[in-house]
């Protein structure tokens, strides 16, 4: 699980909900979910209770909720584990539920790209229609449903009444509306970000830093050289070391037992995990770095580097196109505009970039991939693959350079003077 400020995203969500008085959680897990279960256990470390259900196949949100039907109370919140928002939204939805005796409360906000969302119509305070991803040009409203719901247990009956599909969840809510049940909505204008693409993590990281690191936080056991410079709102965890001539310009986060080496620069919303070494003269700018990563004489800008990665000396991330246009990536065969002209590399777990390798803006590789020394990586590299330059034989020749006796004498005298000067 990738961490932001030392915690998995789902933990930030659980802690936010706990602050608003929610203590009982059901987490639906699927493939790879054991990692979540091992991390949280029964939730007692967080002061909550967590139960788990398993969704054996990825059959959509309605199916996921059906696995938890036996554990559901009469009314309950439904929250995506990878959505981040302000706690005020939960309070507003709870208040709406109490004041209007609603069966379901949806959260919504105005959007421009309406064809990407479920769009609702609201009349006299009640939701009268929900259309999932209306055709572009055919939409007549712009209020989009976002991923926080206050649901009635009666919704499970509606899941069973509509066919299984990608839109089963939304179709069931629409059926619930058509049957004249009371569905209300809260219009929300606060921060909201969903994790769909890797670069979505940058907005989340910025939000968390701005709201969590409001003043410098230097934990016990941190060693900061007198020759180092630490400025702004930084959070440095226990056991970390900031060596001579290093510069840390907040807002930044530096994990436990991480070393920021000599002459390094860490700046601009950089987040570095636990047990990392940012070696001599490296620069890390607005990047998200996992645990146990090693760097040496690197530039890492606007990049996402997962756990256990290693960058050899001189490996560099490019993060800006010469034409200054947005970075566009190919995702599942489709071109996707990232919405930013600053994006570096996206690197999966346990991957390596060899000495003097160059990583083009937005390039992706890993997990378990290797970019060889000197490679200029312009395209994505699949997981578990290696890429190297063609092996070319080195040419060995006589240098054809000889010194006369007089030249040798002059060189010897110069070397003697140099030695005496030292």
Predicted regions and their residues:
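Conserved N-terminal catalytic core of the sugar/cofactor nucleotidyltransferase
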Residues: 2-3, 7-79, 86, 90
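Solenoid scaffold repeats with emphasis on beta-solenoid/beta-helix
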Residues: 2, 216-217, 222, 228, ...
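Extended, small-residue-rich solenoid/repeat segments and analogous flexible loops
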Residues: 163-166, 177-262
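Glycine-rich hexapeptide-repeat left-handed beta-helix
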Residues: 279-422
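Catalytic-core segments of class I nucleotidyltransferases/pyrophosphorylases
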Residues: 77, 94, 98, 126-210
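Hydrophobic/aromatic residue at the end of a short beta strand that borders the catalytic acidic motif
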Residues: 79, 85-87, 151, 311, ...
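Active-site metal-binding loops of divalent metal-dependent hydrolases
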Residues: 82-83, 228
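Conserved donor-nucleotide/metal-binding helix-loop-beta segment in metal-dependent transferases, i.e.
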Residues: 88-115
């Amino acid at each position: 699980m990738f961490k932001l400020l030392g915690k998995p995203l789902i933990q930030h969500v659980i802690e936010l909900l706990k602050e608003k008085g929610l203590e009982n959680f059901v987490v639906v897990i699927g493939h790879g979910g054991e990692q979540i279960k091992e991390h949280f256990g029964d939730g007692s470390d967080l002061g909550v209770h967590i139960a788990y259900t398993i969704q054996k196949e990825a059959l959509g949100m309605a199916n996921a909720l059906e696995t938890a039907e036996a554990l559901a109370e009469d009314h309950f919140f439904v929250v995506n584990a990878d959505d981040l928002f302000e706690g005020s939204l939960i309070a507003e939805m709870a208040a709406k539920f109490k004041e209007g005796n609603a069966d379901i409360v949806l959260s919504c906000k105005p959007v421009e790209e309406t064809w990407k969302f479920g769009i609702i119509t609201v009349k006299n305070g009640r939701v009268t229609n929900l259309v999932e991803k209306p055709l572009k040009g055919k939409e007549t409203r712009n209020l989009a449903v976002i991923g926080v719901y206050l649901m009635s247990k009666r919704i499970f009956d509606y899941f069973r009444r509509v066919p299984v599909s990608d839109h089963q969840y939304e179709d069931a809510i629409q059926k619930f509306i058509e049957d004249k049940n009371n569905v209300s909505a809260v219009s929300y204008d606060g921060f909201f970000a969903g994790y769909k693409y890797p670069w979505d993590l940058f907005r989340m990281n910025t939000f968390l830093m701005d709201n969590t690191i409001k003043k410098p936080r230097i934990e016990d056991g941190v060693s900061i050289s007198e020759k180092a410079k630490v400025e702004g709102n930084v959070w440095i965890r226990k056991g970390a070391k900031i060596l001579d001539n290093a510069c840390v310009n907040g807002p930044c986060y530096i994990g436990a037992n991480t070393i920021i080496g000599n002459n390094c620069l860490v700046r601009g919303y950089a987040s570095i995990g636990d047990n990392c070494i940012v070696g001599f003269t490296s620069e890390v700018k607005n990047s998200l770095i996992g645990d146990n990563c090693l760097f040496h004489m690197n530039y890492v800008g606007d990049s996402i580097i997962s756990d256990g990665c290693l960058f050899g000396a001189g490996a560099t991330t490019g993060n800006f196109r010469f034409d200054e246009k947005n970075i566009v990536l190919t995702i599942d065969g489709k071109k996707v505009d990232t919405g930013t002209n600053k994006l570096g590399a996206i690197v999966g777990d346990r991957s390596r970039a060899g000495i003097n390798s160059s990583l083009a803006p937005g390039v992706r590789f890993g997990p378990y991939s290797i970019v060889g020394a000197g490679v200029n990586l312009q395209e994505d590299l699949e997981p578990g693959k290696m890429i190297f330059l063609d092996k070319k034989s080195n040419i060995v020749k006589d240098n054809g350079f000889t010194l006369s006796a007089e030249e040798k004498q002059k060189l010897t005298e110069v070397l003697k003077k140099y030695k005496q000067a030292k």
